C-alpha cells in the first residue's frame, strides 16, 4: 500500500477532500489494485483503537459492580462526537434561516417597499453565503461522524474477537456462530454510518422549535395546523409500516423456503443431475417463487403508497398552514413562498430526521448492551498444573457441558447422600439425576506414567473427545481431580489448517528445529506430498486447506501436534481420513517410535492400536466401562464389541443413540425432541438459546444444515423482528458492506421452521460454536446458506431546498445494503462475502440496460406512463403559474391600491374560497396521479424479476458440471438471494425514482426558461458538469467498493478459522499471534472503507459546490433582471433551489441505479451459461426396433422387450475425464468392461480418482472416449436417458427440505404402497413410522433429525425405486454405525441381486464381495483382475487385506465366476484374529 497523501495534506485540502484526487484520477484511467490503496492513518489502526477501548473497559470492570460499555465508549469518543454535532447543528440552522432571506428578497420587490429594493442585492449575497457556510459545515461534520463511527466499530471488532478467544467451551456451546458474526456485522454497523443521524435526537426538536417560532411570526396560530398534520402523517405512515411488516412476515417464510431449497440444490447440484431431478427441483422452486411474488407485490404496493403519501403531503402541509390564516386575515405572496420553504424543512425534521435519530439511538444502545453482555461472558480458565509431575492422573472426574450443571450436580449429590437407600445403591443417584441432565463424563479414573500410550475407545457420544477437553482445561470438571504437567500438544479429530504455508502450519509459532522438523515430516508421510508442490513446504494454503485432500490435512494437523515438544500428546482420532497403508505406517513410525518416550493419549477404535497400547480406557455413555491392558480386555470380548463399536440393536440405535447427551453434538447435529428433560437457566441471556421439553428452540436467522454452516448475505431491513436488529442504512453504492442499510424494513428470514407445510418435531438442537469446532467440511454433509433481501421505502420526488444531508438521510431510508446473517459459512467465506470481480465492468454497459428493459413485452405501457408523469409535473407547474398570473386581487387593508404587475398577488377573503377550490382540485388530481402513476412500472419490473429468476434457475440446472465447477457455491446462491432480492425490491422503485427525478428537473427547467431565459443558459453547463462529475467518480467508486468488499472477507474468514481451531490455538498458546492477524485484516478493510468514505465525500461536496455556484448565478440574474413584482422572483428562486436539489438527488439516484444494475449484469451472465450437450451421434437401431422406442425403467410394469438397459453390461473405451474444459486430465485412457450382474470394486489411495470415475460414468465431467451400456453409446441418447440407467448412492448424501415422500419420489410416480414396500426392504419403515405424519413428515435442515446412516438408507431407497440396472456406490459406509452398514449390505444383496454394482469403498469386508477389482493409481488403471489374481500378486489389495480375510476367501479361489458370499463376522465372533476395520 502507498503512503496516504492525507498525512501531508494542508487544512484546505482536508476541508475540501482534495487529497483524494490522485486515487480518483488513477481509478478513472485504469483498474485499481490493492497496492494502489493508501495506508490508514495511525489513529485508525486496530491496535491503537482496541488498546484504547480495552483500557477503558478494564477500568470500567475494575471500578463498578455493573460495568457499562457505554461509559467506556463515552470516555474514548464523546468530545469529538459532540464537536462534530455542533457543526452539524450550525449547518441545520443555516437551512432554517434561508427562507427568511428568501422572503425578504421577495418583499423587496413589493411596490410598497421600494426602500428595500436597494438591499436586495445584499440579501442575495447573504442567501448565497448561507449556502456556502452550510456546505463547509455539513460535509466535514458528516465525514467526521462517519470517521468516529468507523473507529468505534474497529475498536469493538477487536474487543469482541479477543473475548471470543477467551470464552469457555461451555459458553461457546451456547452461542451460535451466527450470533458472533452478527455482533461483528449488523450490530456494530449501527455505529458506522448511522452515527451521523444520532445528533438529530436533539437537533430536530431545536429545529422544530425554531421553525415554529418563525412560522408563528408569519401565520400565528394557524402554523400549528401544519405541524399537527405532520404528526398525524407520521402516525399514518407508522400504520402503513405495520401493514407492510405483516406482508413481509408472510413473505419471509416463503423466501426462506425458496432459498433453503435453492441452497440445497446448489450445494448438491451433482446429486440433482445424477438423480435426473432437474425438472422436479425447478418446479418445486418456481411454485415457491410464485407465492413469494404475490406477497412481494403487496408489500411493494404498500411501501409505494407510504412513500407517495410522504411526498404529496407537501400540498396539504402548506394548505393547512396557510388556509386558516388566509380565511381570517388574507395573505400576501411573500408569506406563501416563505411558508412553503419553512414547511419543507419542518416536514423533514418531524417525519424523517427525528424518528430516524430515535431509532438509531434505540438500535445503538441495544447493540451496545448486547456487546456488553457478551464481554462479560464466562472465560476459559486454565487449570493449575504441576510442572514437575511426570504422570497423568484423573481421579473421580465428573463433568457436564451444560453451564451450571456442576453446581446442580453437587447439590443433587448432597441430597442423595442424605437420603441413601437401604441397599446403598449409588447408581440410583445417576439414574435419577439423568432426569435433569446427563453428565458427559461420570466418575472417570485412570493413571498413566511417563512414556506410556493410553488408547481411549468407545461408541459415538461416549465422551472420548470430552475426556481430552477435561485434560486440556476446556471442560471444567464438576468434581474430581486432574494432575499433569500442563505442557500439552493436541491434534483435533477434524483437521484444522490455518491460512499460511505448510511449514507455518506445522511449526505454528514454535522455534524452528531443522532436524526435528524433517523427522516429523518423514514420520507423518508428508515428504512425498510436499515434493509434488513447486513451492515445496512454502506453498500457501487457503482457509481450511481447501486445496489439500482430507488425508493431507489430517497428516499436517498430526505433524503440528508432534512437532511441539510437550510432555503429553492428545490425539483425537487423527487417522480418520487416511487409507489403511498410510495409517499403519504413520502409527508405527510416528506414534510408536518417534513419540515413544512421550506420554500419549490416543482416541481410536482400531483393534491394532489397542493391542499396542500400554493402557486401554473404554467409555460407554460417559462412564468408564473398562480400564486396563489389552490382555485383560480379551476376557471381556463378548460384551466389549457393542461398547466399542456401538453395535446395539437397531431400535436402540435409532431411538436412543440419536437422542443422547449433549456431547453427541461432538459428532453431528442431533434432535432433542425425545431426549430427557434438560435443565436450563431461568435468566434469559442475550447469547444463550434455551428451551423446555416439548418446545421448539429458537433457531438462528438461517437454519443450519447438517451441522455445517455457511455465511450468508441477507439484504437488511429495519424494524426489529424475531431477533433481527435494525441497522442504519448506507449509500447504495456500497454493496455487500459491513455497514448494512435499513429503514422501515423487514426481517426476511425469521426464526421459524423453513418448511411449515407438514408436521415437524417439537424440539431441535441449535448449532453452536462448539459444533463448528468439532465438525469438518469434508464429511460430505449438506451445507447451507440462505440469503435474501429486503425492500426499501422511497420518496418519489425531492422537496425544494433539500440539502445533501437531507438526501443522505433519505438514502439511509431508501437503499438496502447487505448484512451478514446469523448463520455462517464455515467452508468458504469468500464466496459469501464478496462476488468475484469476474468480467463485469466497473460501470454498467448500455447493452445491459437495453436487454433488461426488453425482457418484458409491456415496455410500451411503461413508457406511456413515464410520459404521464412528465405531463403531470409540467401541468402542476403551469397551474401554479396560472394561479399567480391570473388572479389580480386586492388585500383587505389596501383595497384602494391597485397592482400594476400581475405577479403581485394578494389573496383576500372574497377570493379565498375560489382559490381554495382550485388548489384542492389540483392537489387532489396530482395526489391521485402520484398514488397510482408509478404502479405500472413497479408491477412490470417485478414481473421482469420473475422472468429473470426463472431463466437463471433453468440455466443453472441445465449447465454442465464443468462450468459449475468453476463457480463458487456461494456465488451462485448470491445470485438467487442477494441479486434477485435487489431485482424484486430495490431496482423497481429506484428506477422509477430516477425517471421521476429526471422528468421533474426537465419540467422545472422548462418553467424557469419561460420566466427567465438567461437562467436556462446557466443551467445547461451545470447539467453537463454534473454528468461529467458522475462519470468521473463512478469509475473509481465502484472499484473501491469491490476492493472494500474483498477486504471484508478475511475478517470473517479469520474469525471462523480461529473458532474452528480454538482448542488448538489454546493448546499451543497462539492467541496473541492470531489477534495480530485479525488486526491486519481489520486494517486492510479500513484502508479501503476510509478511502471510499473520503472519495464519496469529495463527490458530494463537489456536487454541492456546483449547486452553490449555480444558485449564486440564478440569484443575481433574477435580482438584476427582474422589475417590480415579487411573484417572478419568488418563483424563480424557489424553482432554482428545487432544480438543483432535485438534480443533485437525481445524480445520486443514477449512481444507485448503476450499482443495482450490476446485479442484473451478474444474472445475465448466469443466464448465458452453456447448457449440457445433446446427443452427438445419430440414432442407432436397437434390437428389432429403433432407439426411440428404448425406454428407461421407470415403472415396474414396463414390458421386458422395450426396457433399456436390460442386462447392465458396460464397456468403457479410452475414457479421459477433466473437471473443467481445458483443465488437467483427472483420469486418462481408462478402458475396461463389466459383465451383466457383476460386482466391481474400485481400489486406490485417497485422491487417486475413484469418485471421479463414478462421476464420469454419469457424464458429470468433461469426458472423452466412449461408454456403452448394453450396446448403446452415451453419445446417441440424451443425458436424462443415460443417467436414468444408473442408481446412485453418493458420498455426499442429499436430503432436501420436504416430506419423506418428496425425497423418495420427487416426480410423484409411485403409490404409497410401493414406497412403503421399498422402505421396508431397506429398513426405513421403522424410522419413518417414528415421526408424526409418517411419509408426510417434513424434513428440514438437510434431514437433521436423521442419522447419517438413515440418510444413506434414503439414497438406497431412491435407487431401489428407480429400478436401475447399474448401481454406483461411492463410499456408502463412510461414518456409518455397524447396524446401518449391515442393513445396506443386506439390501444390496437382495434388491440388487441382478444388477451391475460398481463399489468405491474403504471397508475391507464390503470389498470382499466383489468379483472384479479395478485398481486406479496416478489417474490410470493399474490392474483390473479378479480377487484371486490380486491376492497372488503384490498388489495394493494384498497389502491392505489381513491374513485372516485371505483365509476366508480361500473357498472361492477356484471359481472366479461365482459371486462371493459376504464374509463379515461380528467382532465378538473373532477370537485371536486381527480385526481390520480400516480403510483402503
Curated annotation (Swiss-Prot):
Mode of membrane association: Multi-pass membrane protein
Variant or mutagenesis effect after changing residue 822 to K: In CF; no effect on glycan maturation but decreased channel activity
Membrane-traversing stretches: 78-98, 123-146, 196-216, 223-243, 299-319, 340-358, 859-879, 919-939, 991-1011, 1014-1034, 1096-1116, 1131-1151
Presence of the UniProt keyword tRNA-binding in the record: no
Expressing tissues: Expressed in the respiratory airway, including bronchial epithelium, and in the female reproductive tract, including oviduct (at protein level). Detected in pancreatic intercalated ducts in the exocrine tissue, on epithelial cells in intralobular striated ducts in sublingual salivary glands, on apical membranes of crypt cells throughout the small and large intestine, and on the reabsorptive duct in eccrine sweat glands. Detected on the equatorial segment of the sperm head (at protein level). Detected in nasal and bronchial superficial epithelium.
Effect of residue 1255 to P: In CF; loss of bicarbonate transport; no effect on protein maturation, subcellular location at the plasma membrane, nor on chloride channel activity
Gene Ontology CC entries for this record: apical plasma membrane; cell surface; chloride channel complex; clathrin-coated endocytic vesicle membrane; cytoplasm; cytosol; early endosome; early endosome membrane
PROSITE patterns assigned to the protein according to its UniProt record, in alphabetical order: ABC_TM1F, ABC_TRANSPORTER_1, ABC_TRANSPORTER_2
Residues that bear Phosphoserine: 549, 660, 670, 686, 700, 712, 737, 753, 768, 790, 795, 813, 1444, 1456
Keywords: ATP-binding, Cell membrane, Chloride, Chloride channel, Disease variant, Endoplasmic reticulum, Endosome, Glycoprotein, Ion channel, Ion transport, Isomerase, Isopeptide bond, Lipoprotein, Membrane, Nucleotide-binding, Nucleus, Palmitate, Phosphoprotein, Repeat, Transmembrane, Transmembrane helix, Transport, Ubl conjugation
Described purpose of this protein according to its UniProt entry: Epithelial ion channel that plays an important role in the regulation of epithelial ion and water transport and fluid homeostasis. Mediates the transport of chloride ions across the cell membrane. Possesses an intrinsic ATPase activity and utilizes ATP to gate its channel; the passive flow of anions through the channel is gated by cycles of ATP binding and hydrolysis by the ATP-binding domains. The ion channel is also permeable to HCO(3)(-); selectivity depends on the extracellular chloride concentration. In vitro, mediates ATP-dependent glutathione flux.
Family: Belongs to the ABC transporter superfamily. ABCC family. CFTR transporter (TC 3.A.1.202) subfamily.
Protein name as catalogued: Cystic fibrosis transmembrane conductance regulator
Organism, scientific name: Homo sapiens
